């Protein structure tokens, strides 16, 4: 499975690069196994600062972002990313309390 490039309607011959930013090792591992099994290239970061740095170093085709990160809140990471990139971001979180939900 490949993502279409934002700059072209043509499919790339290279697998899409997905960056997972999540502090839970087991979740990163599960996502990595699932996505690599589907043909994607996957990179992992265990906190928000590493995720921001990794995105700046080599911009991924898409990001899977946890909101409950230990160093920087995931919403802050999202805000910072949106200041300089429009990369697609999927929010993945285990938040379940009503006051923690994103509108």
Describe each region flagged by the PLM:
Residues 1-19:
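Non-catalytic signal-transmission and effector/linker regions of two-component phosphorelay proteins
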Residues 28, 70, 97:
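The feature encodes the CheY-like receiver
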Residues 29-37:
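Charged docking surfaces used in two-component/phosphorelay signaling
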Residues 39-46, 54:
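Short hydrophobic/Thr-rich beta-strand motif most characteristic of the beta2 strand and flanking loop
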Residues 47-50, 73-76:
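Acidic catalytic/metal-coordinating carboxylates
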Residues 53, 76, 83, 96-103:
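Alpha4 helix (beta4-alpha4-beta5 surface) of REC/receiver domains from two-component response regulators
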Residues 58-64, 69:
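Active-site beta3 strand of CheY-like receiver
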